[in-house]
């Protein structure tokens, strides 16, 4: 479950038209969120508020052996008045959904974020963004300031995001703590996104790290034929025949530590279906670290609107070690008790639909006389109950599970109870059945 501040930060990206699809670090983000979702530990309570359209606060209290907490503040130069901030109105998909599909390249500077489901997810219907992008002043010069103080450790973290142009953005993150070298560390990232490709340069004071990474898109909506049709040139019929409803992406990264004189690199590729794809949304990635010999493959699929699954396979060419992991999330429109009894989420919505009249077979007498039956009076039209949309959410919660080759099992149930958003989870070690439970936690969020 995403924290409130991360939800507001994603809303800031959506209001300014910035998409993270072209970032190499998010190449396999879909499978990572489906498999490596965090397990709550202990008890954590969060109280947050979007006090003004430009300012948000969050207070957190934790009890994991010792009592600690944090205080967070966020300021956005872009007004976020249209963002649902009350915990009883925040769409659960924006906080809990893991599968993340790609946006159309033509949506650069448009409305890539949906308050209904969060990131676009392929076949799941999207609602129009509530913020009118044309009414936001200086959205290409927007900025975001974020700070968080952890108590009683007195650890301070801060982040600044500054937009200089529609394609150029700078992000600076810093952490201040006495136990760190020189009392803290800072990471600076320069992002340049042109839609068809994206380039990032980074520098970290921890080890004097210098890095460069990039991602290039081709095929699908990134092809020349499709881009020309979006610009009004080219034949729509020929474009439709040549179009591939998926996008290929290839990229890599290189980094070098100026203090420890060491470096590294990796290469990666991804194929993901586009929102216009009418079939099953899927994402497949392959990353290779030639220096360390690591090969990583992932495959994620949105089998149903309420079911997403992912697998990951890692292999090392030098040591012949391998590791695998699987994960899934299952959305339900039933309460936890009804969900455990077993029922597909769509059954409740379909059970209220009346049966439609079937076509009557020709009578035996008519068949013998080689004629049709006499016409019967037309039956009264059947009224089909419409699916309720106002006052009732499509889903009430989500069940997440993962299993790795080490037989580590993670289970999480996330949902909403009245005005509280909760996450209840546990970690189980199947290799130690005598003491299987490794962690157990409950996280509760409330925002206004």
Swiss-Prot record:
Q: List the disulfide bonds.
A: none
Per the record, the domain of life is Eukaryota
The protein's location, in the record's own words, is:
Mitochondrion outer membrane
Q: What is its main location?
A: mitochondrion
Pfam families given in the database record: MDM10
Give the bilayer topology.
Answer: Multi-pass membrane protein
GO BP of this protein: establishment of mitochondrion localization; mitochondrial genome maintenance; mitochondrial outer membrane translocase complex assembly; mitochondrion-endoplasmic reticulum membrane tethering; phospholipid transport; protein insertion into mitochondrial outer membrane
Question: Which stretches are transmembrane?
Answer: none
Q: Do you know which InterPro entries this protein is assigned to? A: Mdm10
Q: Which GO terms describe its cellular component?
A: ERMES complex; SAM complex
Name the UniProt key words of this record, in alphabetical order. Membrane, Mitochondrion, Mitochondrion outer membrane, Transmembrane, Transmembrane beta strand
Record's domain comment? Lacks alpha-helical transmembrane segments, suggesting that it resides in the membrane via beta-sheet conformations similar to those predicted for other outer membrane proteins and porin.
Tell me the HAMAP family matching this sequence.
Mdm10
State the similarity comment: Belongs to the MDM10 family.
State whether it acts alone or in a complex, and with which partners, per the record.
Component of the ER-mitochondria encounter structure (ERMES) or MDM complex, composed of MMM1, MDM10, MDM12 and MDM34. Associates with the mitochondrial outer membrane sorting assembly machinery SAM(core) complex.
- What is this protein's name? Mitochondrial distribution and morphology protein 10
Print the organism lineage: Eukaryota, Fungi, Dikarya, Ascomycota, Pezizomycotina
């Amino acid at each position: 479950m995403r924290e409130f501040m991360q939800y507001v930060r994603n809303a800031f990206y959506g209001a300014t038209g910035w998409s993270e699809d072209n970032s190499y670090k998010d190449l396999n983000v879909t499978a990572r969120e489906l498999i490596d979702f965090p397990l709550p530990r202990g008890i954590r309570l969060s109280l947050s508020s979007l006090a003004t359209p430009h300012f948000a606060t969050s207070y957190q209290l934790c009890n994991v052996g010792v009592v600690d907490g944090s205080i967070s503040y966020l300021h956005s130069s872009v007004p976020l008045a249209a963002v649902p901030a009350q915990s009883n109105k925040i769409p659960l998909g924006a906080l809990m959904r893991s599968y993340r599909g790609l946006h159309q390249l033509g949506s650069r500077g448009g409305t890539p974020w949906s308050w209904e489901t969060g990131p676009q997810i392929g076949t799941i219907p999207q609602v129009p963004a509530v913020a009118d992008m044309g009414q936001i002043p200086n959205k290409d010069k927007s900025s975001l300031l974020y700070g968080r103080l952890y108590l009683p450790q007195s650890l301070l973290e801060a982040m600044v995001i500054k937009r200089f142009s529609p394609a150029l953005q700078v992000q600076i993150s810093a952490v201040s703590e006495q136990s760190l070298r020189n009392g803290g560390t800072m990471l600076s990232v320069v992002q340049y996104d042109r839609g068809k490709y994206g380039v990032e340069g980074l520098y970290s004071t921890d080890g004097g790290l210098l890095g460069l990474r990039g991602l290039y898109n081709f095929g699908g909506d990134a092809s020349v034929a499709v881009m020309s049709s979006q610009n009004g040139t080219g034949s729509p019929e020929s474009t439709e025949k040549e179009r591939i409803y998926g996008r290929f992406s290839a990229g890599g990264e290189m980094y070098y530590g100026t203090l420890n004189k060491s470096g590294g690199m990796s290469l990666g590729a991804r194929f993901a279906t586009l929102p216009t794809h009418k079939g099953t949304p899927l994402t497949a990635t392959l990353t290779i670290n030639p220096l360390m010999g690591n090969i990583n493959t992932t495959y994620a699929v949105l089998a149903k609107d309420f079911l997403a699954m992912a697998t990951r396979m890692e292999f090392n060419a030098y040591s012949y070690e391998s590791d695998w992991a699987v994960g899934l999330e299952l959305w339900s429109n039933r309460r936890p008790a009804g969900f455990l009894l077993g029922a597909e989420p769509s059954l409740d919505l379909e059970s209220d639909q009346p049966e439609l009249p079937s076509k009557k077979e020709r009578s035996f007498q008519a068949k013998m006389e080689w004629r049709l039956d006499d016409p019967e009076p037309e039956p009264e039209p059947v009224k089909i109950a419409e699916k309720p949309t106002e006052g009732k959410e499509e889903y009430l919660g989500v069940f997440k599970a993962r299993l790795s080759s080490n037989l580590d099992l993670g289970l999480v149930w996330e949902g909403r109870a009245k005005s509280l958003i909760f996450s209840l989870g546990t970690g189980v070690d199947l290799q130690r059945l005598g003491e299987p439970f490794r962690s157990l936690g409950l996280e509760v969020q409330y925002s206004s």
